[in-house]
Structure formats: structure tokens, C-alpha cells
Amino acid sequence: FLMLKNSKVNVRYGPSREDQIKFIYRKKNLPLKVTDKKENFRKITDHKNNSGWIHISQLRKSKSLVLMKEDILFKKKTKFSDPIAKLAEGKLVLIKKCQENWCKVKADEFIGWLELNNVWGIEINNSH
């Protein structure tokens, strides 16, 4: 997984600046799954299954997740901990660190632990 480096990124039909723009992302830090590589371009897929080619200068190592459904941010990495915030479906959060099936994340002004059951943007056995 990689994430968008900038708040406006062109996604193209093919792996070249000469290829037409398919659509434009306007969400900095959005995580994207790399499905192919060609020279300085990466073919990506997002959490809604949109796909296309992005120049590598517009991408960086992923440290973000998207919630696939509403979930709770907890004070500690257990569901028995105090809830800090309810996070909406589609919410973008930034990863601080991951342990087992949990990641400590920043969601707006909140920092807490999120279980990785309902997220997109990380391989579950991947630790940061």
C-alpha cells in the first residue's frame, strides 16, 4: 500500500503523462493498493475499487487507513477499554503504530486504538 502525497492527484488511463486523465483524487493521505508497476508509474486501486495509473512522485509509503464501516476508537487496544470516539464509514485516519490486530491512529483531534476488522489500507499481518 502507498498513499497520496498531495491533495490533488491525477489518475490516468495508462502509465504515461501522455495518457488521458481518468479522474482526480482530492484527498491527501488516501491509502491505495499497488496492483502493477511500469517505469515511474504505479497502477493503483482504492477502497471503492476505482483504479488507474499515478506517477510515483505523487505517492509515498502508506501510513493511513479508511474505515469500511462505522467503528469505535478506544483508549487502549482492547474493546473493554474506554471508547474515545465513534468514527464514520469512509473516515481517513493516520497510523501511529500497529500491534497485532490493532493500530494506534490519529482521527482529527483524537488519538486512540482501532481494531483492524473494518479498515482498508493495510495488510493485516503487517506491523509498523
Language-model segments: residues:
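Solvent-exposed hydroxyl-ligand-binding patches built from regularly spaced Ser/Thr
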Residues: 17
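SH3-family beta-barrel domains
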Residues: 1-13, 24-28, 35-76, 80-101, ...
